[in-house]
C-alpha cells in the first residue's frame, strides 16, 4: 500500500509518501483509491468553491496522471462524482456495489479499468426490506474525527474479489 498517512495496521508493506515518488518500478498491477473529497457527488454542495480555488481540477489531474502511468494493469476506484464527466477518463468501465460482494450496504462506486476484466460479483445480498439505516449506513454516521476514514474504507468483499480475480 501507499498513502500520505501511516497504515492503520502494522505492516512492512506500506510506503508512506507521495505515490509518484514510488510508482516508477516493476509493477504489473496497480489498484488506486485516490481521495474522493473534491470529486464525489456527496460533496456537490461545495463544488462551486472547489472549482473556484482549483481543488477539483487538481484532483482530476492527479487521477488522470495515475491512470496514465506506465503500469500495464490499472484500476482507479472512486464513488460516483465528476470523474465521469469532467476528466479524460470518461465513464467508468463498471460500477460496483458492496451488496454484490457480501455486504448489506449500498455505495455505488466506479471502476476505471485498463488491462483488466470487469470485476465479477461474488456474493450478492438481497437488501429487500432492510432499513436505510442499514443499507445506507455511511450516510447516517454521526460527526466524528474518523467519519471521513470510515466513509472511505474499501469494503473487504470488494478488495477480496479484486485480489482473487486480478491478483
Describe every region a protein language model picked out.
Residues 1-167:
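Conserved active-site and SAM-binding loop architecture
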